Structures are given as C-alpha cells and as structure tokens.
Amino acid sequence: VQEPSEPDCMLGIGKGYQGKKATTVTGTRCQAWAAQEPHRHSIFTPEANPWANLEKNYCRNPDGDVNGPWCYTMNPQKLFDYCDVPQCESSPFDCGKPKVEPKKCSGRIVGGCVAIAHSWPWQISLRTRFGRHFCGGTLISPEWVLTAAHCLERSSRPSTYKVVLGTHHELRLAAGAQQIDVSKLFLEPSRADIALLKLSSPAIITQNVIPACLPPADYVVANWAECFVTGWGETQDSSNAGVLKEAQLPVIENKVCNRYEYLNGRVKSTELCAGHLVGGVDSCQGDSGGPLVCFEKDKYILQGVTSWGLGCARPNKPGVYVRVSSFINWIERIMQSN
C-alpha cells in the first residue's frame, strides 16, 4: 500500500519531523548524519539515536531544539545550522470519516483486537504533564476534547494535563503525533460523568487526526447498532498492551440493561449500555473517558463516553457509557462561549 505522501512540514518545533528537507536556511547542503566529513561529531549519529530516524542528510530535531530542525552543514566553517521547514496547515475534514479504514473486528477490548494504526483518528490519550497515559478521550473539533469527568479528579488545574493525538502506541509516539496542553476544563454541571477540555492551540487536522461527529440532541442509538469502543486499557492478553485496541459492542436498550439480572436499575436515562450479555468483551480501566462510536450511513458518530462497569467483561454486566446526545446543548453552549 502506497503511503500518501506526507506534506513536507512540521508540527510545533518539529521533534517528529520526518521530511526530506536537506538544506539549511542559507541554502547550504546538509552533511549526512552518518558522515564524519567535513565535521567530526559523536552525539547525533544514527547509531547513538536509533529512534530519531537520522537518515541520509535530512534535517531533523533529535534534541528537541526550540528553533526547530537542523543539520550539520557541508560548509567546513559552520558546524550546524537550522533548516527552513514550514509549519503544517490543517486540512479540511469531514468529521467521523477516517482516512484509514478500521478493521472492525468483532473480537471481544478485554477481548478486542489490535486496531489498524490511525483508523480511529479522533481517539486521544489524556496524560499527566509528565506524559503518563491515564484516560482516553475524543476529539470533537480542532480545539475540543470530550472525556469522562472522573478522569479529572486528580486536579482541577488545566496545566496538570496534556492531550496526545495521532498516536497508535501509548509509549512510542508516532512521527506525526501532536502533544497539546489543556487550557480550560469544564465539568458537566449536573455532575454527569462527562467533561470538556479546551486545547491551548487547535489540533492540526491530518490523515491521523480527525474529529468524530456529534449526534443530534437527545438522539437514541438503535438497539444493536454497530458500535465500537477503543482504547489502550488493560487487557488479559498483555502482549498487546500499549497499542490501541478496538472492540465491537452492541448497544443494549436501557430497559433491558436495567433488568434485575443485568444492572438492576442502576442505569440512568442519560447513560447507555453496551456489551455482550455473555461477557468476554468490554472496555476496561485506562479506557475511561474514551469513545463509543457508532457507524451510521457513512460516518462514525460519538454516542458514548466510557464511564463505568461492574468489574471487567463479566457476563451479564455490560459497560455503561454517558449518553452524549443527552448533553449536546451543554457541549455546544460551552464550545460557543469559550
């Protein structure tokens, strides 16, 4: 499969820049990273930095220099110089339409399967300031993420959190991954388990970063609709830990879910249930706040925010999700006034 050519541009300071620019701002040719002529150097060699993709003589930013990508130069009088790499522009987008077709495995996330990289491009990783992943979330516009309120219990200060977009691996971030600080957070006023995060700068919309669609207000998902939950959460098979997983889950109508043998009246009208009544599949911790999306006509619509479940993938105990359609008026009001 031919990768669509990435535009030759950088995000932020270009730490993840993987383009082919090979001249400095003054037009001087770059020295190959593996070469020792005209300049001898030992720190930024491909051997010393296998993860930095120091290939040929392309500009790179292996040390996270605030001035952006650079290279050693072919001018014997000048050791290194910066390169003129433009910032990436956002692409126009249709919400809920991935550029990479999802696998849609009917496996069971404790069951689930590993997702195809970037096939759920609205999935975000909510992290501590130090980069530790602890919850999921969903990009719903370039500047806004929806997550679970209980994910924000550790602190009410936005500076405590950051959002990672466009990554498949929890630890090894993809080249085009974006890390953006949170500038504001809003908890739903009636204490529902849902919250909005405003990003400090808009996400750049790329083929790996695309918002999900929101449902119409008060929309009720059809029983047994084709819905998927995604996340990096705990799985029984820990060999796949750290990569994004998906599971297809049927939605179960509230009156069935609230029967005595299932969740026995605990599910509110502003919540929805999804899961296999025989158990075995479910989203689990670490996927709190993440998306439950349902495919309709030609796009994925965010219908649920992962909230709670009794145990993990136990028979007769489906997972419970906040019903996004119950909060559309609140979501739109906050987004418009901030």
Curated annotation (Swiss-Prot):
Residue positions of the active site: 150 (charge relay system), 193 (charge relay system), 288 (charge relay system)
PANTHER family xrefs:
PEPTIDASE S1 DOMAIN-CONTAINING PROTEIN, TRYPSIN-RELATED
GO biological-process terms attached to the record:
blood coagulation; fibrinolysis; proteolysis; tissue remodeling
Q: Which Cys residues form disulphide pairs?
A: 9-88, 30-71, 59-83, 95-213, 105-113, 135-151, 227-294, 257-273, 284-312
Provide this UniProt record's keywords sorted from A to Z: Blood coagulation, Disulfide bond, Fibrinolysis, Hemostasis, Hydrolase, Kringle, Phosphoprotein, Protease, Secreted, Serine protease, Tissue remodeling, Zymogen
Q: Which GO terms describe its molecular function?
A: endopeptidase activity; serine-type endopeptidase activity; signaling receptor binding
| SMART domains, per database record | KR, Tryp_SPc
Q: Does the keyword Nuclease apply?
A: no
Please give the activity regulation comment for this entry: Converted into plasmin by plasminogen activators, both plasminogen and its activator being bound to fibrin. Activated with catalytic amounts of streptokinase.
Main subcellular location: secreted
Give the E.C. number(s).
Answer: 3.4.21.7
Please name the InterPro entries in this protein's record.
Kringle, Kringle-like, Kringle_CS, Kringle_sf, Peptidase_S1_PA, Peptidase_S1_PA_chymotrypsin, Peptidase_S1A, Serine_Proteases_S1
Question: Where along the sequence does the record put site: Interaction with streptokinase?
Answer: 157, 191, 269
Job of this protein = Plasmin dissolves the fibrin of blood clots and acts as a proteolytic factor in a variety of other processes including embryonic development, tissue remodeling, tumor invasion, and inflammation. In ovulation, weakens the walls of the Graafian follicle. It activates the urokinase-type plasminogen activator, collagenases and several complement zymogens, such as C1, C4 and C5. Cleavage of fibronectin and laminin leads to cell detachment and apoptosis. Also cleaves fibrin, thrombospondin and von Willebrand factor. Its role in tissue remodeling and tumor invasion may be modulated by CSPG4.
- Report the locations given in the UniProt record: Secreted
- Enumerate the catalysed reactions: Preferential cleavage: Lys-|-Xaa > Arg-|-Xaa, higher selectivity than trypsin. Converts fibrin into soluble products
EC primary class: hydrolase
Query: Which protein family is named in the record?
Result: Belongs to the peptidase S1 family. Plasminogen subfamily.
The record's subunit annotation is: Interacts with CSPG4 and AMOT. Interacts (via the Kringle domains) with HRG; the interaction tethers PLG to the cell surface and enhances its activation. Interacts (via Kringle 4 domain) with ADA; the interaction stimulates PLG activation when in complex with DPP4. Angiostatin: Interacts with ATP5F1A; the interaction inhibits most of the angiogenic effects of angiostatin.
Record protein name field = Plasminogen
Record site feature (Site of substrate specificity), residues = 282
Entries under PROSITE patterns matching the protein: KRINGLE_1, KRINGLE_2, TRYPSIN_DOM, TRYPSIN_HIS, TRYPSIN_SER
Q: What other note does the entry give for this protein?
A: Plasmin is inactivated by alpha-2-antiplasmin immediately after dissociation from the clot.
Q: Which residues form the Peptidase S1 domain?
A: 109-336
